Amino acid sequence: MNGTLGIAFSGLAAETRRIDASASNVANARVTGALPGKGGVTEGRAPYVPVAATQGDVRTGDGQGAGVRSGVKPLSSPIVAEYDPSSSDANSQGMVGVPNVDYGAEVSQQILGSRAYSANLSVVRTTDEMTRDLLNMRT
């Protein structure tokens, strides 16, 4: 049962990371900054770069599933240009960099993460109950 708990706990950690990444994207969706110039260099304050949670499976030496590995990575097109000539970060054309956050996708990620977290928590509870029942049978 230890393997079961390890898999469930890695799932809990992965879903926590997914929800954290999405919440960070929503919280920082309007943190604008200067657009990158030539060579990708930003002069001035850089805008928030939205991230996505990544997950990959972990396997034992014999190919058995052993949980998930999670991380975060920047979105493939994290910044979009927006016209805001009043911003101190605006370039000569009045454009600033804005995080490319899709609120609908973020809500979906948060719901998915919450449901998956609950499912992993159910595995932990069930494993705990089964272990308790097994110990009670032995006494």
Q: Which positions does each model-derived feature cover?
A:
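Amphipathic alpha-helical polymerization modules
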Residues: 1-139
